[in-house]
Amino acid sequence: MHIVYDDVRDLKAIIQALLKLVDEALFDIKPEGIQLVAIDKAHISLIKIELPKEMFKEYDVPEEFKFGFNTQYMSKLLKAAKRKEEIIIDADSPEVVKLTLSGALNRVFNVNNIEVLPPEVPEVNLEFDIKATINASGLKNAIGEIAEVADTLLISGNEEKVVVKGEGENKVEVEFSKDTGSLADIEFNKESSSAYDVEYLNDIISLTKLSDYVKVAFADQKPMQLEFNMEGGGKVTYLLAPKLS
């Protein structure tokens, strides 16, 4: 197996999000691409990563290879990764995966391939009443500001805008609309609102580095779905259960 990806920062952003979700994770590396699914211990949130082979600079995977790893160790390993450095993934045996960070200096790490059981994911057929394409940096800032004042993020939407807010001793309210350029597109079925644990959203905020816009979907008292579409066809989907009063 030999894989080359030309910007390690994307993987770094994904691992940062996984670190807050699970202690261990499993990359399912197949000839057609890489997948990963993880569910937090409380079964409140789920992350699904899909990286097709076309998005890699080099991709030679003759047969399926499962790579289990400790998220904290992987995060430390990638901490020093620089802009536009390549990451090279090699494996000559199922026991050890060699990761090379290639830039001004080549740093090589031999990572033990640990046994990680894939999570059992129930079949869900979610229907959303609001589907909005929102500026990623704007959403990042809004979540961060709400996390400073409240433990719950309230989101609502109509045919023209999406509003997120948090209330504690202070109040933060952020509006995304086409007039301000923060809302690229919206699909509207009916006015909807729901509440979510802002800490869970703040934990995966690194994913906003993957794309300029985030697809946000929700409905009354239903899970929220965030979809990050990467260059080359990669996609990271995050589902968060609602906070029920």
UniProtKB/Swiss-Prot annotation:
Pfam families: PCNA_C, PCNA_N
Keyword field: DNA replication, DNA-binding
InterPro entries in UniProt: DNA_clamp_sf, Pr_cel_nuc_antig, Pr_cel_nuc_antig_C, Pr_cel_nuc_antig_CS, Pr_cel_nuc_antig_N
GO annotation, biological process: leading strand elongation; regulation of DNA replication
Top-level taxon of the source organism: Archaea
Molecular function in Gene Ontology: DNA binding; DNA polymerase processivity factor activity
Residues spanning the membrane: none
Family: Belongs to the PCNA family.
Function recorded in the entry: Sliding clamp subunit that acts as a moving platform for DNA processing. Responsible for tethering the catalytic subunit of DNA polymerase and other proteins to DNA during high-speed replication. The trimeric complex inhibits DNA ligase and both 3'-5' and 5'-3' activity of Hel308 (Hjm) helicase, but stimulates Hjc, the Holliday junction cleavage enzyme.
Subunit structure: The subunits circularize to form a toroid; DNA passes through its center. Replication factor C (RFC) is required to load the toroid on the DNA. Forms a dimeric complex with PCNA3 and a trimeric complex with PCNA2 and PCNA3; does not form homotrimers.
NCBIfam families linked to this entry: pcna, PRK01115.1-3
Protein name from the UniProt record: DNA polymerase sliding clamp 1
